[in-house]
């Protein structure tokens, strides 16, 4: 199964790209993050439908902010949209930061359950430690956990449980959760992960992030007689921008 991760980007009045880490906190303070999440969800569904015309075995990871879960009005809009597109639930994975997922209040937990009841699955990213309770996560609908490869391989990582990082994939698998090693940027990392039984990887090594075409835009033109492709700027999205952040590679090594 090929999957894409969407990352939102904004443009300022000088047409400069603003990364999520630079605007999310401001958007949350201004009460705009829910609107951004809603727009990104719509874009994810548009692209997912486009991809599924050619390949049904495809999936998309879509980030959702904790503030969106906490705001009943904003969440209601998102839920209505996801309800209308619940046929895509098996292919649309909603992603939350580890720190946010650990600190969900009553309202957020109820909203999360509403999404799970409609068939949506969840992913955890921005993992900073391996204090993971697979049973609890599985009960809440988590089916993927993205752990930085460096964290898995760090010999100085303090033991957070009785299980070694090399056994984490097997432990999660018992509860129906797939471990994804992310931020893989070199072949050496792939080799080092072979003993960890990691079935999925994400990172620049597999595919760098790239902008998506606006909905309805024609595909990029073929190279001309001189072998030159059209300028990349012709393929850029208007704000907010979503980028595919490395297709997940099935099996880090082994026969294809």
What positions do the PLM features span?
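Catalytic core of bacterial c-di-GMP phosphodiesterases, primarily the EAL and HD-GYP domains
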Residues: 1-8, 13, 32-107, 183
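EAL-family c-di-GMP phosphodiesterase catalytic domain
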Residues: 9-13, 65-72, 92-104, 120-256
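Conserved, function-defining core regions and hallmark residues within catalytic/recognition domains
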Residues: 23
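Surface-exposed amphipathic alpha-helices with a cationic face
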Residues: 48-52, 83, 109-119, 166-173, ...
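A conserved signal-transducing helical linker
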Residues: 27-31
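Short beta-alpha junctions and helix-cap segments that line functional grooves
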Residues: 20, 108-111, 133-134
């Amino acid at each position: 199964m090929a999957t894409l991760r969407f990352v939102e980007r904004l443009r300022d009045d000088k047409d400069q790209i603003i990364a999520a880490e630079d605007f999310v906190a401001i958007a949350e303070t201004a009460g705009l993050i829910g609107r951004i999440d809603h727009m990104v969800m719509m874009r994810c569904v548009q692209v997912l439908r486009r991809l599924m015309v050619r390949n049904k075995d495809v999936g998309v990871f879509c980030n959702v902010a904790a503030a969106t879960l906490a705001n009943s009005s904003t969440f209601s809009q998102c839920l209505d949209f996801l309800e209308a597109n619940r046929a895509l639930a098996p292919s649309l994975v909603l992603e939350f930061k580890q720190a946010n997922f650990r600190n969900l209040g009553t309202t957020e937990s109820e909203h999360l359950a509403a999404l799970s009841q409609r068939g949506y699955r969840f992913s955890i990213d921005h993992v900073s430690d391996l204090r993971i309770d697979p049973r609890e996560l599985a009960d809440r609908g988590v089916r993927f956990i993205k752990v930085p490869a460096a964290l898995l391989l760090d010999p100085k990582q303090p033991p957070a449980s009785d299980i070694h990082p090399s056994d984490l994939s097997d432990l999660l698998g018992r509860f129906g959760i797939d471990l994804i090693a992310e931020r893989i940027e070199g072949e050496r990392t792939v080799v080092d992960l072979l003993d960890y039984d990691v079935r999925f990887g994400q990172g620049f090594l597999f595919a760098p992030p790239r902008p998506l075409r606006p909905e309805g835009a024609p595909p990029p033109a073929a190279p001309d007689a001189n072998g030159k492709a059209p300028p990349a700027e012709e393929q850029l999205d208007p704000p907010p921008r979503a980028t595919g952040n490395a297709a997940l590679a099935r099996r880090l090594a082994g026969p294809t």
